[in-house]
Amino acid sequence: MKIIVSLFAVTIFFAACKKENATTATIEFIEPLANDTIIAGDSLHVEGTIIGNNEMHGYTLKMVNETTNEVLMNITSDSHASSYAFHEHRMNNVTQISTIAVTISANLDDAGKQATKTVKVVCLP
């Protein structure tokens, strides 16, 4: 009988333990704004924050010219933190009117779960 009571107590103990909340993140762009137009010779300014409710496992900032499929920038941070600030510049040197997708992906855990936000701008030659 003592064994049954002990097993019952252990079962109740483990059942009462709460799982840690899944990590979530809010990604905010300060710049660029959606559909901004960047003229030739100007810099495409990318700035913003990633705020998580738990520790995250880094982030990636990627710029892709959707007109030519060229990857213009691909920066990865592997640092573990509950918040990040990103700030990058890239000179607009396109040779044709191009849509540029700026994507931030926050790595929420080691299993590959991500939060992602994309802003698209137009670059003029």
Segments (PLM) and residue ranges:
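Surface-exposed, short loops/turns at beta-strand junctions within beta-sandwich domains
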Residues: M91-T99
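Solvent-exposed loop/turn segments flanking beta-strands in beta-repeat/beta-sandwich domains
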Residues: G52-T67
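Extracellular acidic, Ser/Thr/Pro-rich low-complexity tracts
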Residues: D36, H45-N54, L108-D110, C123
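Short acidic/polar inter-strand loop motif in beta-rich domains
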Residues: A106-T116
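C-terminal motif of bacterial Sec signal peptides marking the signal peptidase cleavage site
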Residues: F13-A16
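Short, compositionally biased P/S/T/A/G/V-rich stretches that sit at domain boundaries
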Residues: K18-A40, L124-P125
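C-terminal edge beta-strand
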Residues: A115-C123
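Aromatic sugar-binding surface patches on proteins
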Residues: S79-H89
